[in-house]
Amino acid sequence: MIVESVELKDFRNYEFLDMNFNEHVNIIYGDNAQGKTNILESIYMCSTSKSHRGSKDREIVRFGEDESHIKLNVLKHGMKYRIDMHLKKNKTKGIAVNGIPIKKAVELFGIINIVFFSPEDLNIIKNGPSERRRFMDMELSQLDKIYLSNLVNYNKVLNQRNKLLKDIAFSPSEQLMQTLDIWDMQLVKYGSLIIKGRKSFIEKINTIISDIHSRLTGGIENIKVCYVPDVDVNDFEEEVRNSRQKDIKYKVTGKGPHKDDLIFLINDNDVRKYGSQGQQRTAALSLKLSEIELVKLVIKDTPVLLLDDVLSELDSNRQNFLINSIGDIQTIVTCTGLEEFINNRMNINKIFKVTDGHVVNEN
């Protein structure tokens, strides 16, 4: 899979940008706050329809303008795809694939598979459960459209059930309680499918990550990712029924996969609680490299790797390991300088310098 080019108009600090990428290693360098990450953000949005920063569309449109445009050209399995995305300040974004508008943004998932790695990915290890659920959902949604459909349906049911709980709390009635029975059935139906999907995903990650982490640490550490579902699939219906009165009291659904978590164990110790920052970084790197290998297995193609100022966060051994692991993947890297690549003798195929929203091809 190759990102051939990206064209931006009024996107963040870019009035206009047209970039053509090499199929191997592309370096985008420059000082901080010049617009390097904005380029990666535009590519990521064409994969998931959302910013990795969590930004709203109106925050992405260049200051003083009403809309922005992304055009991405991709080569996948010998077929060309053009993704056009219009972001508007006060309207829903418009998306087209090969000139054909798509009705729902979720239809974009799976067309281009992206693995995005930035220093913020350390949050997957050290922050709260929502970061780890988001990781599972974003990766699974790119690989499995059925999972994505179940996730969308579950979130709709969850929102409707929470709204109904508030109505019941303020004005209880038999009719509302009967409606709650219906939403409970839907919650269990879609929630169970999500739990099964996440369980299978983590099992696959574990078959890959153990070897990667062992090699990364010279064999002195072993890693295991433990999926911790909030409820067991077999007990889900009963758990929801038993928590009903509590849910009505607090006006929110207390049981389900929206409460799931992951635990990362290094040598049987929870790295979030007991690991050093170096161990947490290594665990995050192992996880991202495992993502790459899993995508290869599932789609029978390589993903596009976006590295946002990551090498500066790693020591020389981990830099070398990462660089040696991505030789067959198109990689687009942002950084402030070229020293890490020169020191690691990395083959650089294309170099771009960014200065205040202006990009110069230095090849």
Curated annotation (Swiss-Prot):
Cellular component GO terms held in the UniProt record: cytoplasm
Residues that bind ATP: 30-37
GO BP: DNA replication; DNA synthesis involved in DNA repair; double-strand break repair; SOS response
First-listed, main subcellular location of the protein, grouped into a coarse class: cytoplasm
GO molecular-function term, one example from the UniProt record: ATP hydrolysis activity
Entry keywords, A to Z: ATP-binding, Cytoplasm, DNA damage, DNA repair, DNA replication, DNA-binding, Nucleotide-binding, SOS response
Compartments reported by the entry: Cytoplasm
InterPro entries: DNA-binding_RecF, DNA-binding_RecF_CS, P-loop_NTPase, Rad50/SbcC_AAA, RecF_2
Highest taxon, organism lineage: Bacteria
Family: Belongs to the RecF family.
Record-linked HAMAP family: RecF (MF_00365)
Functional description taken from the UniProt entry: The RecF protein is involved in DNA metabolism; it is required for DNA replication and normal SOS inducibility. RecF binds preferentially to single-stranded, linear DNA. It also seems to bind ATP.
Protein name as it appears in the record: DNA replication and repair protein RecF
